[in-house]
Amino acid sequence: MTQEILKDTQSRMKKSVQTLEADLTKIRTGRANVSLLDHIEVEYYGAMVPLSQAANVNVTDHRTLSIQIWERDMVAKIEKAIINSDLGLTPNTAGQNIHINLPPLTEERRKEMVKVVKNEGEQAKIAVRNIRRDANQSLSKLLTQKEISEDEQRKSEEEIQKITDHFVAEIDKVLMAKEKELMEL
């Protein structure tokens, strides 16, 4: 029973770290990244679909994204979706291709982004701690139902704390990498 709680705790904490990593890819750094446009949706035959389902997005160089659009009539819709996004990007259209030059971030903007990254990291740490609390409550419930002994509970709580420490360190590592990426010129 305690093994199930430990496995569930570990998988939920791993998902928290993966969610943090996914959220951080949406934060614009000075470097081009195809995931920057992942959240942009365009109208495609009456339905809203992710940009990646209407075009190929590639990194041309460290500051340029290239979008190859599959259908000519989608060019204007995709261009409009990029302009209307919260990324502040200006697309340059050439036939069925759109090129996006990413302007370098100002020092002030970089510092703002670092604050956002730290906030995202803190939210992930809170999620991990909440998962730890839930697991410890499950162990307490098993103890009151006499399904485990106090020694098993204590040993499992120590194991949960080790798992928590591991994932908090993992979050710190992800945050440091993103902050370093943001502060690079």
Curated annotation (Swiss-Prot):
The source's superkingdom equals Bacteria
Q: Which residues form a coiled coil?
A: none
Q: Check the record and name the NCBIfam families matching this protein.
A: frr
Instruction: Report the HAMAP family cross-referenced here.
Output: RRF (MF_00040)
Q: Which family does it belong to?
A: Belongs to the RRF family.
Q: What functional role does this protein have?
A: Responsible for the release of ribosomes from messenger RNA at the termination of protein biosynthesis. May increase the efficiency of translation by recycling ribosomes from one round of translation to another.
Q: What name appears for this protein in its UniProt entry? A: Ribosome-recycling factor
- Organism whose genome encodes this protein: Dichelobacter nodosus (strain VCS1703A)
Taxonomic classification: Bacteria, Pseudomonadati, Pseudomonadota, Gammaproteobacteria, Cardiobacteriales
